[in-house]
Amino acid sequence: MLSPMTTIGFLHTADVHVETFHALVAERGHRDTHLVDATLLADARAHGVDEALTARLHHRLRELADRGPDVIVCTCSTLSGYAERAGLPVPVLRVDRPMAEEAVAIGGRIAVVATVASTLAPTRDLLLECAADADVRLAPCLAAWALFEAGDHEGYRQAVAAHVRTLDADVIVLAQASLVPALDLLGDLTVPVLSSPRSAVDRAVAATA
């Protein structure tokens, strides 16, 4: 007997993530719907996450919920903690929680790689929420973000991969979905390098089972 088909809604802050998450959902034989609002992250980076921005975020999540998904994933690590608290009638998941849980289960020195500064504190806080004694070490790679914004995705993943290779850690967390393409250049590393999209989709499917 076939398992029921789940519809997963995604709120993104960059168009590039639509293809990534669509492919992961299609692999599992489910449906997806996407809403992209780049201004949410742009304003968070420029001004921080205040009440007005949180209200806008929750409004966009309600728009997405009106499409009828069974579960929603916010794929922006800067904002996903606020998305979890939207209080919608469907579950709203943060993209990086399953990854964080896996990282603290591995333990040791956890290096957090991010190319957007506003992602660092939320990811650190999430790891410490998962394990209060986690040894979290921030490893920003902020100069690479200009490559992403310019559309130089190959240069971006090369820069991220080169940065990851300099780190001394027991597990490395790629704190943004945009960092995932760098994984293809890091297959020879013996240290686990974790990313969020695949585990987030698995968690979303499980949430509706």
Segments predicted by a language model, with ranges:
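Non-catalytic structural scaffold of enzyme domains
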Residues: 1-209
